[in-house]
């Protein structure tokens, strides 16, 4: 051997059993990496050495056992009982046994090398026999478990004269003093090698060198199949399994296969429920030591991995790698089924289960199955109610650490992830990725029933339950069932009244962070979502999506009861309650019940008098933001929605839809009392109140009652004299916007409503309906007292007042409708007293 040349033994690292057991799983992985990397560097320097047996075993991720024959066991009969056979081969009279290095040395002195059969036997034996002076080193490098010396040897371990430096802690010898100093740091815990980039410290210099590659981005180990590069050889070896797809180790419990025995062992602990590694901080247990180490970083708050783009810090290096792909847009893992690409292999594996439909993890409580174990673990918290992670700001608890971290960003108001398309910021990279799909219009998830496409898988799941009608999540308070767990969680806040998210501008509180974010855009006036058809801008993407359907006319959701179509599934669900008549939301003030919770909230503001939304033009305040938006159109005069039939324009799409039903003549909503049809359900609801005679709205001034709140508002203006709506043509003022709209037709002379029977035109749709009944002869309004029928509800009202005053006025008979005018004076006198 040439003096000064480097051999594999010069760079090999040895461990005793005591040392090996002190190492954490990630440190054992480091050993594999270091040994493989050292060998790789020697080859790259031009060393013409054959591959050591230990390298072959490490590449295959096998344990390097020593193999002993039965002949040896006759000379040393207590070997088998002392150390135990690992594998017996009756044909060759051979068994595997785990021996300490000094026992191997002692046996080889007595019986020679023929007592042993080494793996890769001929190759290893020739090298071993050629290096008699290095027997101990070659066997020691194979990570053989180190035991106490058995009684039969009667000798101390033989120490090589080339290793004069002894460790006083464990008795291990080293050839260099520097190696001894490095080794002693294992016992002392000293970490003298510090990274200048992030400050992290290490026990060994090789660990620091490996770590620095994360900062430099150096990736010297490249896959020949796909060209992907890695920092470490073990990473490359694991990656190669993706291409070979060898899975030799199968779980007997669930049939799942693995390409490494260690992965199978780790997986089997899931079925066994064994979790020997417990956190001293919070008591949480894990089935792997590496998982415990990762978990403990949550308590220490250590985040050594920093992104150079946005300076965001992470606990784990894999999190930094995943995060960096948000900036680069790299998605190296592609699904062969639908061509969708992912930033991480784990996400691809998770996605592929959607196509396979595989769900091996089942909940023992309710039988629900999941494709991933972490999904099952999250689901279990529903049954246990456990929420160990608490926010120090507001006291809210979560069942997952990631949810707590996401929640805390709401308080910190940190939004490091910015969309390059529209500039919107997000506190999570996942939210940015979801948001970017809005701009790309990508919708890879398609419903098999109706072929409707969705951007996200959860939207598809939610949509499918419209077809199946499945609602597995039930509220224990009121029994209401929901198709999604998030809907149930949102609903529960109605009962608890909890609203932890408060607006700093106006103090209004919300039960969801997303609602607060939506609300804050009211103060900023930001409207980033613009319609490409008409240029109208919206605060929320949902509003834009709804608006776009007005241009396309798309209505995929059909009511099976009456055949009506809707643009949104939520609108269909709301509509269904009309047929069922169910009204689960009741006002505690007046007992009035509502079909929807939002209707109850709107109603309650009438009792409280709360009007937080004020018009900057005229100072008028409103209880709802939508009311303010409608009001603003009075000042701007904007009417973007135009009827194609008659050219009339409207400031709201709902008004246009309502108007179009006049031309179509469609009236799907029929009153069960009198059979009258209506084009809108709200009109039917208003009409039904005429039959019930309920008048819940009372004037505080004169105690007069009204069926509708708008009637009370209109009536108040009689007392106050307020007339806020002024005609710009003649200056005349009105108490109601509808009165102003009717008046303005006088100036324009517009009469868009034409009778098909006689051709007569009218400036109001209600005026058209009245003469049409002349042609049809229809009289739907009947007096319950005398059975007389009328064409118009106004005629019925006047008739009922005549009947009411008949006795006090000594009126014996009420004749034809022409008699009404002759009695008006008497009615007026009676009413005024």
From Swiss-Prot:
**Any one Gene Ontology BP term:** regulation of transcription by RNA polymerase II
Localization, UniProt: Nucleus
The family database entries (Gene3D superfamilies) matched by this protein are listed as: 6.10.140.140, Classic Zinc Finger (3.30.160.60)
Annotated zinc fingers (C2H2-type), start-end = 165-187, 193-215, 221-243, 249-271, 277-299, 305-327, 333-355, 361-383, 389-411, 417-439, 445-467, 473-495, 501-523, 529-551, 557-579, 585-607, 613-635, 641-663, 669-691, 697-719, 725-747, 753-775, 781-803
- List the Gene Ontology MF annotations in alphabetical order: DNA-binding transcription activator activity, RNA polymerase II-specific; RNA polymerase II cis-regulatory region sequence-specific DNA binding; zinc ion binding
Alphabetically ordered keywords of this record: DNA-binding, Metal-binding, Nucleus, Repeat, Transcription, Transcription regulation, Zinc, Zinc-finger
Q: Which residues form the KRAB domain?
A: 6-77
Cite the InterPro entries for this sequence.
Answer: C2H2-ZF_domain, KRAB, KRAB_dom_sf, Znf_C2H2_sf, Znf_C2H2_type
A Gene Ontology CC term for this entry? nucleus
Q: Does the keyword Zinc-finger apply?
A: yes
- Origin: domain of life: Eukaryota
Q: Which family does it belong to?
A: Belongs to the krueppel C2H2-type zinc-finger protein family.
Sum up the protein's function in the record's words: May be involved in transcriptional regulation.
Q: What is the protein name given in its UniProt record?
A: Zinc finger protein 780B
**Taxonomic source organism:** Homo sapiens (Human)
Q: What gene codes for this chain? A: ZNF780B
């Amino acid at each position: 051997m040439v003096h000064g040349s480097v051999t594999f033994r010069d760079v090999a690292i040895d461990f005793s059993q005591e040392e090996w057991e002190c190492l954490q799983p990630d440190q054992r992985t480091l050993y594999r990496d270091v040994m493989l990397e050292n060998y790789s560097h020697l080859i790259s320097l031009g060393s013409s050495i054959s591959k050591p047996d230990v390298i072959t075993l490490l590449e295959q991720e096998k344990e390097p056992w020593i193999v002993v024959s039965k002949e040896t066991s006759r000379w040393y009969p207590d070997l088998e009982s002392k150390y135990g056979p690992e594998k017996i081969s009756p044909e060759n009279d051979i068994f595997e046994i785990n021996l300490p290095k000094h026992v191997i040395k002692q046996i080889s002195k007595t019986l020679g090398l023929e007592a042993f059969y080494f793996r890769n036997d001929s190759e290893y034996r020739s090298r071993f026999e050629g290096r008699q002076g290095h027997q101990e080193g070659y066997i020691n490098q194979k990570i053989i478990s180190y035991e106490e010396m058995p009684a039969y040897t009667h000798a101390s371990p033989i120490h090589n004269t080339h290793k004069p430096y002894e460790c006083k802690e464990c008795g291990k010898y080293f050839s260099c003093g520097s190696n001894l100093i490095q080794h002693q740091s294992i016992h002392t815990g000293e970490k003298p090698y510090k990274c200048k980039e992030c400050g992290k410290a290490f026990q060994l210099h090789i660990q620091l060198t490996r770590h620095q590659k994360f900062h430099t981005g150096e990736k010297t180990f490249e896959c020949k199949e796909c060209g992907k590069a890695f920092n470490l050889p073990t990473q490359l070896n694991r990656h190669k399994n993706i291409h070979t797809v060898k899975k030799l180790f199968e779980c007997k419990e669930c049939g799942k296969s693995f390409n490494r025995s260690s992965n199978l062992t780790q997986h089997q602990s899931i079925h066994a429920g064994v979790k020997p590694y417990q956190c001293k901080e919070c008591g949480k247990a894990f089935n792997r030591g590496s998982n415990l180490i990762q978990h403990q970083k949550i308590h220490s708050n250590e985040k050594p991995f920093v992104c150079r783009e946005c300076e965001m810090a992470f606990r784990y290096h894999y999190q930094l790698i995943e995060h960096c792909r948000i900036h680069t847009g790299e998605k190296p893992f592609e699904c062969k089924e639908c061509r969708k690409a992912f930033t991480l292999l784990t996400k691809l594996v998770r996605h592929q289960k959607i196509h396979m439909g595989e769900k091996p993890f089942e909940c023992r409580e309710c039988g629900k199955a999941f494709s991933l174990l972490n999904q099952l673990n999250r689901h279990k918290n529903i049954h246990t109610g456990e929420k160990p992670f608490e926010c120090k700001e507001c006291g809210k608890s979560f069942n997952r650490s990631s949810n707590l971290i996401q929640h805390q960003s709401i308080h910190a108001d940190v939004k490091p992830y910015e969309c390059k398309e529209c500039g919107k910021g997000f506190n999570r990279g996942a939210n940015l990725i979801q948001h970017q799909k809005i701009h790309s219009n990508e919708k890879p998830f398609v419903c098999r029933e109706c072929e409707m496409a969705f951007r996200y898988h959860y939207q598809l799941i939610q949509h499918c339950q419209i077809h199946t009608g499945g609602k597995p999540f039930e509220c224990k308070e009121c029994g209401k069932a929901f198709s999604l767990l998030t809907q149930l969680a949102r609903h529960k806040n109605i009962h608890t009244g909890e609203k932890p998210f408060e607006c700093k501008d106006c103090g209004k509180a919300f039960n969801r962070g997303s609602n607060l974010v939506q609300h804050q855009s009211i103060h900023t006036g930001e409207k980033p979502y613009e319609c490409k058809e008409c240029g109208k801008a919206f605060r929320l993407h949902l509003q834009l999506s709804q608006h776009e359907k007005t241009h396309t006319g798309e209505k995929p959701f059909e009511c099976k009861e009456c055949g009506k179509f809707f643009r949104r599934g939520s609108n269909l669900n709301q509509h269904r309650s009309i047929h069922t008549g169910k009204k689960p939301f009741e006002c505690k003030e007046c007992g009035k019940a509502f079909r929807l919770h939002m209707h109850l909230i709107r109603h309650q503001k009438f009792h409280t008098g709360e009007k937080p939304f004020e018009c900057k033009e005229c100072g008028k305040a409103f209880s709802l933001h939508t009311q303010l938006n409608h009001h603003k159109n009075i000042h701007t005069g904007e009417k973007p929605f135009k009827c194609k039939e008659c050219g009339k324009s409207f400031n709201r799409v709902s008004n246009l839809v309502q108007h179009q039903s006049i031309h179509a003549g469609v009236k799907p909503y029929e009153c069960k009392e009198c059979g009258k049809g209506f084009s809108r359900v709200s009109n039917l609801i208003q009409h039904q109140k005429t039959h019930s005679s309920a008048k819940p709205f009372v004037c505080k001034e004169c105690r007069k009652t009204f069926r509708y709140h708008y009637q009370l508002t209109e009536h108040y203006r009689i007392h106050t004299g307020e007339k806020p709506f002024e005609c710009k043509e003649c200056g005349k003022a009105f108490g109601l916007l509808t009165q102003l709209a009717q008046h303005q037709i006088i100036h324009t002379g517009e009469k868009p409503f034409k009778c098909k029977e006689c051709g007569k035109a009218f400036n109001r749709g209600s005026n058209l309906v009245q003469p049409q009944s002349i042609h049809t002869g229809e009289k739907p309004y009947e007096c319950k007292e005398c059975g007389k029928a009328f064409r118009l509800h106004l005629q019925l009202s006047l008739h009922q007042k005549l009947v009411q005053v008949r006795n006090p006025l000594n009126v014996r008979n009420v004749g034809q409708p022409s008699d009404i005018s002759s009695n008006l004076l008497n009615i007026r006198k009676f009413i005024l007293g």
